[in-house]
């Protein structure tokens, strides 16, 4: 029987969350993502304005989960992820709560295992297209975990992380792409970004996001430089 990808966060996964594979619904078909309708599409704020690593086109929700970048380290990579909390459900404040250490373990049976995690991403793009920033781009967010890019391990130190609210099993929204592409261009104007990649590409076999449904060709057509080897 096919297995369902189910987000399982493990404290041993330094600076990140791990994704294990199993079927949580024995004897049933894989669970389909719960779809909560997104608000009407909104045009994201189009800006290249940054202040101390904070993008002025985002809602700012500071997280305590970050580390200073090593002296002399430059930001050269953007890593795309997906996340949904509770798993396969959209909307609500759980992702923001996770990244700010305010997750309520009583709110959902899945949440107790998240309470002691200290993870974050620089940005979250919600299904509506709302962009939320948690960590200054000048600092290292705790998003990539055990990872490697072009022979360099520990991608947190030289990357920016963007979480897209979603999962591996359905497309992202039009509003998310409308927000993501201007954000990527703004990042490239502010930082010496060399390429954009996925978590699945820097942690193969351990991670699968942003997943099969992410539209890499759309990014390439918009002039975003993708990491070598990304074709779809």
Task: Name every feature range the model reports, one short phrase each.
Residues 124, 161-163:
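Conserved beta-strand segments that form the floor/walls of ligand-binding pockets within enzyme
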